[in-house]
Amino acid sequence: MAQSLTQKAVNNFVRGLITEAAELTFPEGASVDELNCDLRRDGTRRRRLGIEYEESFQLSSFTLSDNELVSVGNWVNVGGNADLEFLVLQKGSTLYFYNKSDLPYSAQVEAFSVNLTSYEQSGSVGAENAKCQFASLKGNLVVSSSAINTIVVEYNISSVSVSQISFKIRDFEWQGNTTTYYSNDSTPSQNRKYDAQNTGWNTGNGAPTDLTKRLTHPWYSGKDADGNYSSSEFGKIYGGTTLTGNGHYILDFFTKNRQSASGITGLTKPTDIEASRFRCVESFSGRVFYAGLESAENAGTILFSKLADTISDLGVCHQVNDPTSEYLPDLLPTDGGEIKIPDAVKIQKLYAFQNSLFVFAENGVWQISGVDGVFTADAYSVNRVSRVGLLQPETFVEAEGVPFWWSRFGIHTLSTDPVSGQGSEQNLTIPTIQSFWDAIDSDAKLKVVSTYDSINKRIYWAYPDDGEAVESKLNNFLILDIPLQAFFPWRVENQTSSTDCVVGLAFYSGYGAKELELDVLTNSGADDVVTSAGDDVVSSQVSNFNTGDPAIVLICRDGATNKLTFGGFTSSGFLDWGDTNYSSYAETGYDFIGDLISKKTAPYIVTYCRLTEEGFTGNESIGYTAIRPSSLLVSTAWDFNENFQASQQAYRKKFPVVVDPNNLDVYDYPESVITTRLKVRGSGRSVRIRYESEQGKDFLLLGWGVIQGRNPRY
């Protein structure tokens, strides 16, 4: 009996890599394995472009050693100019600033830099060994890391000034045994004396000096009819076992010198030292939040500044009104303060979204929310939204207002309830690429960096090879296309020796601003204005620029000099670094043609590829070469065989192309799609197809059709 023939069309091979499906349950449109393919939302699949330096690139004046780390951040609204944005590049212990205003990007480094060793915390791992986190507020940049005292950078017309933030809090910690404070003590301990003064006793302005009274109510509750303190009146008040309010003293958060503040010696903790420093910083609700201390006492502590009007407000993390005051003890909505999450372990990242601040620790995620959509010091809530924490801060990325991060178990995101605003964690890798993710080396996961392309809606995570000796080198990319909800991997190949390499990622929107100096003239431009000393008078103004297409920018280290420059995936020569081949391929899932029992054949596959040639280079003497030629190699494997048959060329043009020497920009081919029919040998119950690139050539696969023959015999 003759075979029954059917046809199948595939035109949406863009679901990405799937490793969590079995042979019999593999989803349509997904790949079993793939590398270096660009999945496009129109349903096509293309070879990624090669990596190269930007046009007219410049090398940095500084070098990057094998052991130096690199971290990247953004400074927005620089100096209060909404159009001015800097890329902040941490190289070891130095911060460099690149204006995002103009091309080439690598030439836009500012003349100023910040030496972090000047603010290094004694006993830390060193400023060069701790990556910074950044927050922008009111045109200023706040910089934190576990190795430095938190600083703020101000932009002052082509220069910056740096100041260390001094964190002040009110002391709400009782020093003595509070169970004895419900009664008078004629011989109070030194700790009790401090606690009495911290509740308002012996602090001047009419406060009595007697430190023997019980601390169940404030001293001014004992005033007589004349407004004077009366010990007998104070004694008439029953306070029970309630402690009065404290917090009169304002102390430095990192060095709580109670002896100096109170003048009392002999305290159990005269000076309370916090040796660690804030790892995280985030601006939210007009304030700056700080977290990430490593001590047992303060691991879950989050400080937040008062509503910041000036730089001096950034360290005011306390109630402005004295809580022991008789008339103005109230906590104000605009005050600073302290939030404690006792069960948080190693807070890694703070992220502000809508009316909430999300706290990412190693052991979970917490949400700090305001009331009625506004965070205030006197009205907020804290709740835990996930027990899945953040592996390390640079895996975190925000895309379309939604956080994505790597944990010890996979890649996660948060969805928020549109009514309550409460977050809910979702694991993205369990149904998709968990096996692929698990295979990434544990040390490599600790060096992941990320960025988000907000134009093309893609998240890029980059990480090194196993055992990579260069601290900041990144060879591998895992990409998540948000609209497609598809993961796909890329890999940058090394040159044979002294290879260039990627060390960082950034996103450039294509817009920016820069400061211009204009010569001041008079008399309709005829006369130049100078000072009495003969110096030329100029006027500074900020102008906006369109820098071109938005793009992911790669920060690269030049292999010959170890200096830095910028590049991207832009080479239509389809070679990495201009001379190194890379393989682009994709393998389809297991196609049983709707039948698990019968054996089949696929005598013909018809592929559809878009014409990619864009013209010619060369001349009559040396010949002409097509610009951006394509090649697509196709092979098949039957049943569950991992060895594919010999490949065939699927990009076959039917018509000759005549070169017009007078117009090399034209590639005069009559069709925009190359259609090729391939004969396929073999048979089996299922078939897989592999598409692969050829060195130095493009491909753009639109889809394919398969003629399927089914054998009526089993």
Language model segments and positions:
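Beta-sheet repeat architectures centered on beta-propellers
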Residues: M1-V109, S124-G139, V345, V388-L391, ...
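N-terminal beta-propeller domains
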Residues: M1-V114, I157, Q164-W366, Y463-I482
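Intrinsically disordered, low-complexity serine/threonine-rich repeat tracts
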Residues: S122-S124, S146, N205, K223-D226, ...
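Conserved catalytic-core segments centered on acid/base and nucleophilic motifs
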Residues: Q348-A361, W366-I368, P393-S407, I411-L414
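Surface-exposed extracellular loop regions of Gram-negative outer-membrane beta-barrel proteins
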Residues: L357-V385
